């Protein structure tokens, strides 16, 4: 089941560059590697992800580094801060492929500028787990999901505005 908004997005962006084309755009900077080591430990390494080269015309697969995807997200963030042209990056990957690193590492970079990262997740248990893991790394994170009261949500949002929250997890209905 695909939501019509997702279908519309895919149709609108069908001529966007595919992940397999990122290889030519950016190289992984040492500062990005340093962030990986800081938050994932001194033995951490970027893994390779298998992606379709061009899913519109076939199922040929190539491998791309998590680091290159992270670097691309960081560069797109920098482009947006300078009001330069940006592009979307769309990724689907199975459980265990390393998707959390793909948005968390750029978010650590973004947080150095005082900006916040908003993550939309339909799974409350996953959100709670992600928040707990981030807090264990010394990163301020909160989650807002169904079943929370208005006052509790207002307090959490105030913490985003006036506190030092770096990650805000939201369930789609919020």
Language model: regions and residue ranges:
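N-terminal helicase ATP-binding lobe
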Residues: 1-174
């Amino acid at each position: 089941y695909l939501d019509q908004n997702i279908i519309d997005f895919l149709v609108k962006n069908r001529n966007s560059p595919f992940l397999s084309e990122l290889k030519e755009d950016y190289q992984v900077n040492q500062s990005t590697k340093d962030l990986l080591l800081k938050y994932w430990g001194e033995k951490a390494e970027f893994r390779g992800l298998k992606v379709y080269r061009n899913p519109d015309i076939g199922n040929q697969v190539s491998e791309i580094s998590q680091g290159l995807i992270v670097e691309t997200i960081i560069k797109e963030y920098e482009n947006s801060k300078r009001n330069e042209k940006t592009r979307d990056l769309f990724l689907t990957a199975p459980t265990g492929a390393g998707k959390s690193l793909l948005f968390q590492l750029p978010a650590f970079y973004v947080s150095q500028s005082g900006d916040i990262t908003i993550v939309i997740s339909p799974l409350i248990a996953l959100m709670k787990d992600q928040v707990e893991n981030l807090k264990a790394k010394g990163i301020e994170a909160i989650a807002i999901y169904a079943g929370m009261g208005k006052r509790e949500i207002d307090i959490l949002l105030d913490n985003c505005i006036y506190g030092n929250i770096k990650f805000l997890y939201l369930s789609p209905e919020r």
